[in-house]
Amino acid sequence: MLSARNLSTNQATLVGLIAPICWGMSVSLVRGIAEGFGLAQGQFFLYCVSTLCVLFTVGMPDFRKIDRRYLLIGIPTANLSSLSFCLAIFTSSGGAQTMEVGMVNYLWPALTILFAVLFNRIGTRWWLYPGLVIAFAGIVVILSGDQGFSFAEFAARFAENPVSYVLALTAAVTWAGYSSMTRAWGGTTNPTTIIFIVDTMIFGILWLFGFGAEPVAAGSAHGIVSVIFGGIAVGAAYAAWTLGMSRGNMAVLAAASYFTPVLSCVFATFWIDAELDSGFWSGVALVVAGSLLCWDATGRGMRALKVAGKKEKNEE
């Protein structure tokens, strides 16, 4: 079982950097799994593999040490995020739209920072808000395509498949909410294994009721490979991120997570044959730039709070 006890800060940070790479693979792999097995069956297999991974790396938490609010509200919020994300990818209509939906979901870093400022009293600077605007502008550029932004084009793309985009936004908001709850109620408890077990049960029940089983009855070779790599990637991402957060450099890991969309796009070009125009890449650049600006504004604020806290302790 992985443990941060015997790792230095630099070693733990290097392990934590595995998480953004694995998350960058997730959008395309989820789509491949859905196409190979159907939504519920594919995700059931995915989370079975992931659960085995985290059982051996993270282990089961002590229920007696979990805050009741975290258990009853926080963990279900994480499950809702997983379900919304998978439904968003499954209901997308093509390779490029899958990436658009994925980019909407990738608003979670900026939303997480915003929630931390609003609900967790994290200090920040004024350029947080321009950063949020830039990140949202990137989504607008992506949805408008290579022809440039127009309200008509934006409305047409959204009207084409609104459910998928709304689900992606729901996934982003709920993940940001879960992150905020983790900061407030999580303590030292790591509930990853519980979350994965519940996710497995949810998709298992959906599969039994025949939900999302239309694409392929018996799975394809591409779907099987996607399940294996997807399960390992998701499990490794959670395990690595948890270890990195517990002992590594949080600032470096937070900055690295904002490059997940870029890694996702690179992986998609050969895994799901996504055709990405220049407008899409311009939007990716804006999302990354806006998210980094948000991180910098919050990072400076957190450093200021730490300095103030040390001064108060010295005065006492």
Which sequence ranges carry the predicted segments?
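Glycine-/small-residue-enriched transmembrane alpha-helix faces in small-molecule transporters
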Residues: 1-41, 84, 137, 150-184, ...
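C-terminal-most transmembrane helix of multi-pass membrane proteins
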Residues: 2-5, 45-47, 122, 223, ...
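Membrane-interface helix-cap regions at the ends of transmembrane helices
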Residues: 2-3, 21, 25-32, 36, ...
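Hydrophobic alpha-helical transmembrane segments of multi-pass integral membrane proteins
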Residues: 11-15, 37-56, 68, 72, ...
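Specific transmembrane alpha-helical segments of multi-pass solute transporters/efflux pumps
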Residues: 22-29, 61-99, 141, 232-248
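Hydrophobic/aromatic residues within transmembrane alpha-helices
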Residues: 33, 42, 88, 118-123, ...
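Specific alpha-helical transmembrane segments that line the substrate/conduction pathway
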Residues: 41-51, 87-121, 250-269
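Loop-to-transmembrane alpha-helix entry segments
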Residues: 67-70, 96-105, 120-141, 162-164, ...
